[in-house]
Amino acid sequence: RGIPSSLVAASVMVSWVWTTTIMGSAEAGMSFGISGGLNYAWGNSIPFFVLIPLVLHLRKKMPKCTTFTEFITQRYGAGVSKLFFIFGIGVIVYVLIAQGVGIGIVFNSMFGIPYEVGAVIPLAIVTVYIAKAGLRGSIFNDVIQFFIISIIMIVSVPLILQYLGMENIYNGLVDVVTNPDNVNYNPEALSLASGGGFRYGLTAVVVAMGQVLLDQGYYSKAIATASSKSLLRAYVIGTVVAWMPIPIICGGVFGCSVISMGVGEGAGLALASEAAPYIMKLVYGGGLGSVMFVLMVFMAGMTTGGGCLSGAQALFTADFYKKYVNPTATEEQQMKFGRKITFVVSGIVMVVVILLKGKSLLMMDIFSGILFAAPTSSLIAGMYCKRTSPKIAVFSIVCGLASGLIAFFVIPNEDINWFVGNLLALLVPAVIVIVGSLFSKYEYDFEKLKAYEPDHAVN
């Protein structure tokens, strides 16, 4: 603990700049027009404003807490904690997979490097770094990469607009809106109030809710902040001021520029996820600009992957190794185990990334919302409501996950199944938790949390 808020703010911004932030928001721009990047931005930001009061409340109620599963263990018991542990690891694995897939697509699109090589080598690099440096290494490395990403964005966007011409982009978008024969035909492409874009924005809230609230990396950064005031300042600056402009720009500039030229999936692009690298390669050729863009995506993937792996270290060390493998483990033994598990998790991710060659980053992200949104209601309720019982928590998670998956696979309309599936995954558990708690006779004593002492050192 005791890391300054300025460092945490930079770290939050960079660790939330995923390959999906750059390439997925560009894909959203292709799909939903000028509203795509905007809806990506606000949808993915809202969960941080759920996380901030949650962590502030947790610091007050449970001062010695270092992982969210420690809280779950004390609040709901060991059984429910194991379930949340699985979800927490699942989020980490998914996010790492998304980074590997994105980096692999960029290296392949820009330089013709085999997808498998471009995806695996960066994962190997960040694994070795985090295994040696841990969380503090992750945060200070984030600061360096914060400046690299910012500089590349500031330089590249004006050059792209100058190369393509604002008038040409606008005229191309008008054709997208008015010409049914256009490969990207979308009557709402020039509307900020696009219905499809707004549905995607709501879906983005659901997707990010699970990714943020179940990602131990964000808890680790928040807990490492010097004070509650610094925490609030760091997360507001890191998300609203520093992060939100990036997907708005990527969706508007990369995504809309591509569709304005009549280029789309199957019509110049093998995948819609290639929109961002396509436009950069068009403008820069294979020169310095292309190298800059690859560097930016590489940095985004590295920092996000680093944050995930540091979170995996914390979860496995505090909530698995110490409890179930070696209860008498020293701090040194726990750290050694944490380094080993970093390599194991990364190895599994590398295999999955290779198998996902050719998949859309945006659709991967949307589907992940169904998987990880279900536990968030019981997590939030557990922080504030004493009448939410372990049985209610588990039942809500099972129902939310089942309803979301059923909707996604049963609804035949692919333009709406992802939206309904995500909403059900979030709202069904919320309704069950609220109604169940109202009629529950269970009561939890929150005073127990203040006396909690972890089995590992808290500095």
Feature map (PLM): residue ranges:
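Terminal cytosolic tails of multi-pass membrane transporters
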Residues: K322-K323, E414-N459
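Transmembrane helix-loop boundary segments of multi-pass membrane transporters
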Residues: E27-W42, G100-E116, R136-Q145, E332-G338, ...
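Hydrophobic alpha-helical segments and their helix-loop junctions in multi-pass secondary transporters
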Residues: I92-G100, G104, M110-I121, I125-A131, ...
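Loop-to-transmembrane helix boundary motifs in multi-pass membrane proteins
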Residues: R75-K82, V93, A314-K357
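Helix-loop-helix module between adjacent transmembrane segments
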Residues: L38-A131, T203-A208, M299-G307, G338
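Hydrophobic, small-residue-rich membrane helices and short re-entrant helix-turn-helix hairpins
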Residues: P63-T73, G134-I144, L214-P247, E265-G268, ...
